Amino acid sequence: MPPADSNITDLIVASCADRPDAPVYAVRNGAGGWVDVHFTAFLTQVRAVAAGLIAHGVQPGDRVGLFSPTSYAWAVLDQAVWFAGAVSVPIYETSSAHQVEHIVTDSGLRVVAVGSEELGERVAEAAGHAGVDVATFPLTDAGLAELAEAGAFVSDDAVEHARSLATLASPASIVYTSGTTGRPKGAVITHGNFVGAAINVLHFAREVVQWSPETTTSRTLLFLPLAHVLAHAVQVICLYARIQVAHSGSPATLLDDLASFH
């Protein structure tokens, strides 16, 4: 395992240093195809969004909610939360206002990124019932661009300081169950949990992600909700291993996405 005072972002930064030109994500180009996002470009965007979070008052250890369908923007914000030293709290997009209220109060959420106006209204209803103030911002490409613009005055050193504060024992994410059999239950996933999963899957179960040290052509299409801990972990593992990931955010587009991203 890496040093105890390191965290999952150190593993990601080191992987990027090894292959900065690796295509780690693919996004739709609007014409039925996909465009590569290379590692350096991805981390540049992550750092800019992390600066935006810091500019909006997010402090190390704060909880940041992600309430949105599976998407590239989700992947960017997830890493940006960690680069800001904060803790991600994924929320299933199917969660009711009552379930969101429980997650807000249980985790201490004060800011939530939402994938749609309707999800934002659900957060507002939940916060109103809970009697707490919860800020929201859109978890979209445009929303992330606005966040990055807001962080333009935050120095690279400030982001790097925030990024380096967490250790392997620090919380990285609070993952909640879907709530189908009762109140959603939260489990704290540490930076060490994600680091251990990334290293051990590649070492002992590399066939899970079709990875080998000799190839950089493996690709994964993620369609599970990223609020699900398996999908969340697979995304982190793939980024560390430089396995290219694309996202399918709706069952309606899944077959087309599978056919075009292969």
Indicate residue ranges for each PLM-predicted region.
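Active-site charged/polar residues at nucleotide-handling catalytic sites that mediate phosphoryl
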Residues: 106-108, 130, 260-262
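Conserved pre-ATP/AMP-binding loop-to-beta segment of ANL
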Residues: 20-23, 152-176, 182-183, 209-219
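ANL superfamily adenylate-forming
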Residues: 31, 118-168
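Conserved AMP-binding A3 loop
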Residues: 36-40, 172-199
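Conserved AMP-binding/adenylate-forming core of the ANL superfamily
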Residues: 4, 24-79, 96-101, 105, ...
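Conserved S/T- and glycine-rich ATP-binding loop of Class I adenylate-forming
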Residues: 64, 81, 112, 171, ...
